[in-house]
């Protein structure tokens, strides 16, 4: 099995990249893909860039170039669930756009025309991620992750998301675009991210301070998942 791993920022991929054995690099259209092995598992690690367009472009290149069997989206996220703190883990059971609105034509909030209302994550890899959580004894929440081209920093956008998507546990800027492309290709995916900030009026300060913590925690999670795959 080959596992595709996607992070948006340098800080979100650097620890995993350093762990890749027999590493080779592929660059195109501002994206970087690193292939090799981690824990004996074939991986293709993509640094996509920030936002939905960059994520969709990079995911398409990853799926065409490396043809992974599954995609794990890793990195940082803003926490929405009350039980989440910096360094805790979120696992997607589904993802939605929070900034798409074609409700005038009968679609659900966050649903893009011609697309599912939500993109469900792969149940087998959700279970694998949960097993890794149990082994590492980390605090984690499983649920809806929402994505949009905005860093949520302030009461008004936060209230809008919580009102429109009351079940959302985390917010970030790439996961749904990644899932959308995976859906088009028929490739299973799961989002496993660590909390860098709790979405509120000071979230930009928390993000700057705790991004490295989130990167370390999400890297631990991905490595634990890969170790479980290697043991099968």
Curated annotation (Swiss-Prot):
Pfam families for the chain: PNP_UDP_1
Example of a GO cellular component annotation carried by this entry: cytosol
Enzyme Commission number(s) of this protein: 3.2.2.9
SUPFAM superfamilies cross-referenced by the UniProt entry: Purine and uridine phosphorylases
Top-rank lineage group of the source organism: Bacteria
Reaction(s) catalysed (UniProt annotation): S-adenosyl-L-homocysteine + H2O = S-(5-deoxy-D-ribos-5-yl)-L-homocysteine + adenine; S-methyl-5'-thioadenosine + H2O = 5-(methylsulfanyl)-D-ribose + adenine; 5'-deoxyadenosine + H2O = 5-deoxy-D-ribose + adenine
Active site: 12, 197
Listed GO MF terms: adenosylhomocysteine nucleosidase activity; methylthioadenosine nucleosidase activity
Enzyme class: hydrolase
Cystine connections: none
GO biological process, one term: L-methionine salvage from methylthioadenosine
Keywords: Amino-acid biosynthesis, Hydrolase, Methionine biosynthesis
The family this protein is said to belong to: Belongs to the PNP/UDP phosphorylase family. MtnN subfamily.
Function, as annotated: Catalyzes the irreversible cleavage of the glycosidic bond in both 5'-methylthioadenosine (MTA) and S-adenosylhomocysteine (SAH/AdoHcy) to adenine and the corresponding thioribose, 5'-methylthioribose and S-ribosylhomocysteine, respectively. Also cleaves 5'-deoxyadenosine, a toxic by-product of radical S-adenosylmethionine (SAM) enzymes, into 5-deoxyribose and adenine. Thus, is required for in vivo function of the radical SAM enzymes biotin synthase and lipoic acid synthase, that are inhibited by 5'-deoxyadenosine accumulation.
NCBIfam families: MTA_SAH-Nsdase, PRK05584.1
Subunit description: Homodimer.
Name recorded for this polypeptide: 5'-methylthioadenosine/S-adenosylhomocysteine nucleosidase
Organism name: Pectobacterium atrosepticum (strain SCRI 1043 / ATCC BAA-672)
Gene of this entry: mtnN
